[in-house]
Amino acid sequence: MKMPKNNVYTVSRLNGEVRQLLEGELGKIWLNAEISNFAAPGSGHWYLTLKDNFAQIRSAMFKGRNRSVTFKPVNGQQVLVKGSISVYEPRGDYQLIIESMLPAGDGLLAQQYEALKMKLAAEGLFAADTKRPMPTNIQKIGVITSATGAAIKDVLHVLARRDSSIEVVIYPTQVQGDSASKSICKAIQTANARQEVDVLLLTRGGGSLEDLWCFNNEDLAHEIYNSALPIVSAVGHEVDTTISDYVADVRAPTPSAGAELLSGDAENKSEKLATFIARLKQSWQHYQLKTEQRSRSLENRLHRQDPKRKLEQFQQSFDEIQIRLNAALNDKLHKSTLQQQSLSYRLNQQSPQHRLTLESKHLDYLTARLNEGIKGKLNDVEMSLKNSAHQLETVSPLATLSRGYSITQDESGKVLLSSKDTQAGDTITTRLLDGEVKSTVI
């Protein structure tokens, strides 16, 4: 076989070019999948497998990215991730490098929101030079909101406190649900047709992304953009930002803030400053959108040459080795522990201490039996002594004395058996049970 002169690849070169091809062709992608084999080693990086019912792909999310994730991923969880395809060159495996991760439910809405925001920004609906100026002397405000919600109460309270001369026209509308966007569009059309107010305040209270979803509608965005009347969007809380906020001429963070923005009082200069800041913020947001679009192109071009990617791959390889090494060490430690326990048991069975313990127990048993035998023998001896004492007591002279008899002795101690053994003047001693009586013979 003739060897080709050109295009002879090494494995490293092949994997490197495959990586560049995949990263360059696909760019950033969104993926809806289930998490499995999730691992978070000490390096702070995350390694996981993303799968559906028919396929799976290895994935990595490095700690510089996963710090922004607001939840702890678990196996079996459905998520929506954004990332780019790459190749882990040491193994030749292709994998997904994750940049952002959301729970699947919130993630789909967030993805739709980002897609619509990019589309409308490209169409120029957020451009600062298209914003209508706020009237300088507002006499009548049109409020587009629910007639029974908390937002209208907050707005009326603020206007009454700051400038009671301002008239309010309420254009009641739905602010939540599938038909809310059409209802809001109709209210804007009605206000523009009547031309009875100086400015419109589009508002409602806070809620979840799903609750505020009607304000992220494309038709509503165009209706706000095409309105002849200037519009202030005051939807949700400080942290909530909707498409209507981007398209409106001015954005206020809350319904109360929107009412304060449009009402004049002694602090008019401060309000103008707040308006300027709000518009400046919108201009900055528009600038950020444009910058983000330009940076994506540069990011994709620089991504393949980024030294950080090489470092991340080395870190991933190190983490995998560490995970396998820890598993092997734990297995070895477990086996060694079992072996040590077995040897300890066998050694205990053969040790002198063990035998000494057994013999000591046997000695204790024999001692107990000996003590019981001695105790029994002593009891027998005691009983025999008691019997002998009783027998001796029955023949004792003292026993006779106890029955009223006495013993008489002369001075020498001799027992007198007859009166003939005495003479007049002799001293005799009569012994009774409880003492002695001395007498003189007459």
UniProtKB/Swiss-Prot annotation:
It is found in: Cytoplasm. Its EC number is 3.1.11.6. One of its GO terms (cellular component) is exodeoxyribonuclease VII complex. It catalyses: Exonucleolytic cleavage in either 5'- to 3'- or 3'- to 5'-direction to yield nucleoside 5'-phosphates. GO terms for molecular function: exodeoxyribonuclease VII activity; nucleic acid binding. Pfam families: Exonuc_VII_L, tRNA_anti_2. InterPro entries: Exonuc_VII_L, Exonuc_VII_lsu_C, OB-fold_nuc-bd_dom. GO terms for biological process: DNA catabolic process. Keywords: Cytoplasm, Exonuclease, Hydrolase, Nuclease. The keyword Cytoplasm applies. Heterooligomer composed of large and small subunits. Belongs to the XseA family. Bidirectionally degrades single-stranded DNA into large acid-insoluble oligonucleotides, which are then degraded further into small acid-soluble oligonucleotides. This is Exodeoxyribonuclease 7 large subunit.
